């Protein structure tokens, strides 16, 4: 099972400059198995793009499923955000930690543009960067 980060899906849904690379990465991931989006990524998409029903319908049409966070992922996300805030002085949004922890503990990989962040805070998580 492979998770997808909200900015990656937003790029595709808005036909951004990297949409072709995202489409290729998603197609390859779908050929290999189930592709999912977690609660935090779904909420980010609904907040930034369209209403929730349209976002969910678009994801379902692409073959992307919803995968809720388990408590272990939520706890890891909180721990990693606290660590990041202590190191850098200000915290990144909790949603990026929720997405990373979900991918690490509940999935096999994450499709993301932010490989450096995820490598730093989610050691061992396999990353797929569209276009790389």
Model-derived regions, located:
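Short, well-structured N-terminal submotif of metal-dependent ribonuclease cores
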Residues: 1-37, 46-60, 128-132
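Alpha-helix capping/helix-boundary segments
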Residues: 8, 41, 73, 98-99, ...
């Amino acid at each position: 099972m492979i998770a997808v980060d909200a900015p990656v899906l937003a790029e595709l849904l808005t036909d951004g400059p990297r949409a072709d690379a995202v489409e290729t990465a998603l197609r390859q991931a779908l050929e290999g198995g189930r592709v999912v989006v977690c609660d935090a990524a779904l909420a980010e998409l609904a907040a930034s793009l369209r209403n929730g029903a349209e976002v969910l319908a678009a994801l379902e049409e692409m073959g992307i499923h919803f995968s809720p966070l388990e408590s272990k992922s939520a706890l890891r996300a909180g721990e990693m955000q606290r660590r990041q805030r202590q190191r850098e002085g200000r915290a990144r949004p909790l949603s990026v930690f929720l997405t990373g922890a979900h991918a690490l503990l509940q999935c096999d990989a994450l499709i993301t543009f932010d490989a450096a962040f995820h490598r730093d805070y989610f050691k061992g998580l396999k990353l797929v960067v569209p276009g790389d």
